[in-house]
């Protein structure tokens, strides 16, 4: 399966959630994860490489820099079909910008995970990204996830935004709450606090994916990191 974390603009916690979800799948399931950093900032790969050099914990998965100039992955239809039909997770962290060079990735992804906030800037960029997916005729399943959600704050535009997004994809019921612990995330583990911060939305996400792909869960103790 091909899963892409994408937005039109940075700042919604896209890479943090991509890393957290890659970790969560690797920790919770037997499914192999392969990470691809398609963002020009290379934050995902940079963090993975930093963790690799420190060597404190065994790696959960490999991450590659995806260079569209050298890598012809999306020009090989047989390889694309192999990825889409596999129960392995090919997870892409896309750049927070709109460019035609990302069209193939967005078209061939099985799931596009779109983090958003209820700020005016995030709302506008999310709607622009939604329109772009329509423009390139992407038929990928679109899954919207609330990021850095503050449950103590009243979002005046939440009801209207939720209704609008639900017309174009699946809006996860559970948000990822604003937690400082997620800013200390690495690519090698999820401690219990980090798991608690993402458990509900990610379990909801895995349930959706599990309707199409075979998700094999590991037996796990609550005290385990990963």
At which residue positions do the language-model features occur?
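P-loop/Walker-type NTP enzyme "switch/lid" segment
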Residues: 2, 6-8, 12, 19, ...
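NTP-binding/hydrolysis catalytic cores, primarily Walker-type P-loop NTPases
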Residues: 188-226
């Amino acid at each position: 399966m091909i899963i892409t974390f994408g937005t039109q603009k940075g700042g919604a916690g896209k890479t943090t959630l991509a890393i957290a979800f890659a970790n969560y799948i690797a920790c919770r399931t037997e499914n192999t994860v392969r990470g691809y950093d398609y963002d020009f900032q290379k934050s995902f790969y940079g963090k993975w490489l930093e963790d690799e050099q420190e060597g404190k914990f065994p790696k959960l998965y490999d991450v590659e820099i995806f260079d569209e100039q050298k890598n012809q992955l999306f020009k090989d239809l047989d390889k694309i079909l192999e990825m889409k039909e596999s129960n392995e997770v090919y997870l892409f962290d896309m750049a927070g910008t709109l460019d035609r060079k990302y069209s193939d990735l967005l078209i061939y992804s099985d799931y596009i995970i779109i983090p958003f906030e209820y700020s005016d800037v995030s709302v506008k960029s999310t709607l622009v990204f939604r329109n772009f997916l329509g423009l390139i005729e992407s038929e990928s399943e679109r899954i919207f996830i609330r990021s850095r959600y503050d449950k103590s704050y009243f979002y005046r535009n939440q009801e209207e935004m939720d209704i609008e997004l639900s017309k174009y994809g699946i809006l996860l019921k559970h948000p990822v709450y604003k937690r400082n612990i997620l800013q200390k995330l690495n690519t090698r583990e999820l401690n219990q606090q980090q798991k608690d911060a993402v458990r509900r939305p990610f379990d909801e996400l895995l349930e959706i994916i599990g309707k199409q792909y075979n998700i094999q869960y590991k037996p796990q103790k609550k005290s385990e990191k990963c």
